[in-house]
Design a protein with these regions (language model features):
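Short helix-to-turn junction characteristic of helix-turn-helix DNA-binding domains
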Residues: 40-44, 199
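Conserved adenosyl
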Residues: 119-259, 264-266
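Conserved Class I S-adenosyl-L-methionine-dependent methyltransferase catalytic core
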Residues: 14-31, 38-39, 63, 67-179
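Core SAM-dependent methyltransferase catalytic element
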Residues: 341-362
């Protein structure tokens, strides 16, 4: 049956708007990577020559980028009737957190950097879809790695200690007990922001970060050193099962990781074995719908987007993978936990648009 004309027209309009949005996201990536937003935040308003000099880019490119950003409504221009070389642009204060402040709760510019990383592996993705193979995480490169670390950084540094752990008062009390320093593991630690945050918020605790990606571990060590907690935070290049040999742990963090594990039951069983008596596991994973339904809301659409372009391919790159994809529903978390020997997961009453939180007990 032919698609009714109005429906086709609506789809054309939707894809046109998506193309505009995609182009603007890639321009945001350039602004982030080249330090253009930071230059405007620190020294604006600037004309093209001023931005070029401060950021070390060519003046002609600076002018075009500034014009594009102002047309997109991301930057403000003092006088759009001025000659092109004389126009001065600024980063509005209300946009600075979104685009130029890595610790701001509204900082979502790293999404653009993640998409740039995906762009670099599209040919490999097409081949993986044909062959049934995968695309290893490292293949996505520094852009995706830094984007992923950056998008998680504000929540891990601020919400984790002040909101997420606060939902488990007994765990917070254990972390603050200086008479018996607590041990914490951050499984799939990535850039180490969660490990750093726990160490900063709880000076008596010692934290081990574990991740398979060597480049991420190197980044995490730099972040811990810069934060002044390297004496209490250690990072290890290992998979999730490596936690079993480094315990016992009073708390294990599995933040935005469970859906990415190739062998999640094996990993959770190792984590269970690594828990100290009375220990807990905090899982944060996607707040997707309880069951598949189409069309879905924006969160469901985003998670399926990450799944087809990143999460599933990285999982398929590992042997004997469960190939969960990104869309990890609550019933699946329950099944995985019970298969690993845990009891019923407790869903914590934490309000969050993207994550659902589960507590597992020893």
């Amino acid at each position: 049956m032919a698609i009714p004309a109005p429906a086709a027209e609506a789809l054309v309009e939707r894809l046109f708007d998506a193309t505009v949005d995609a182009l603007e996201l890639f321009s945001i990536h350039l602004g982030t990577r080249l330090g253009l937003y930071g230059a405007l935040r620190d020294a604006g308003p600037l004309d093209a020559a001023g931005l070029a000099a401060r950021a070390g880019i060519h003046e002609r490119y600076a002018r075009e980028w500034l014009e594009q950003q102002s047309v997109a409504g991301l930057l403000a221009v003092e006088d759009d009737l001025a000659a092109p070389a004389e126009r001065r642009y600024s980063l509005p204060p209300e946009h600075a957190g979104v685009l130029a402040e890595p610790d701001d709760p509204d900082h979502v510019a790293p999404f653009a950097t993640m998409l740039a990383g995906i762009g670099g592996v599209l040919p490999a993705l097409a081949e993986a879809y044909r062959s049934g193979g995968g695309v290893p995480y490292a293949r996505y490169g520094a852009d995706f790695r830094h984007g992923q670390g950056g998008i998680n950084r504000p929540a891990f540094r601020h919400d984790l200690p002040s909101v997420w752990l606060a939902a488990m008062p007994d765990v917070q009390a254990r972390l603050d007990d200086a008479s018996r320093p607590a041990r914490v593991a951050d499984v799939g630690c990535g850039h180490g922001w969660a490990a750093v945050a726990v160490a900063q918020a709880h000076p008596a605790a010692r934290v081990d970060g574990i991740d398979l990606d060597r480049a991420s571990i190197e980044d995490a060590r730099e972040h811990a050193a810069a934060a002044g907690v390297a004496d209490r935070v250690a990072f290890f290049e290992d998979d999730a099962t490596g936690s079993a040999g480094r315990g016992p742990y009073d708390l294990v963090l599995v933040l935005e990781v469970l859906h990415d594990l190739a062998r999640p039951v094996e990993a959770l069983a190792a984590i269970r074995a690594a828990l100290a008596p009375g220990g807990s596991v905090l899982i944060a994973d996607e707040r997707v719908a309880d069951a598949f339904a189409a069309p879905g809301d924006s969160v469901e659409r985003m998670m399926y987007g990450w799944s087809v372009l990143h999460c599933l391919p990285t999982q398929m790159a590992e042997s004997s993978s469960a190939a969960l994809g990104t869309v990890l529903r609550a019933d699946t978390v329950r099944e995985l936990a019970e298969a690993a020997g845990f009891g019923e997961p407790e869903v914590l009453p934490i309000e969050n648009d993207l994550f659902r939180f589960y507590r597992l007990r020893a």
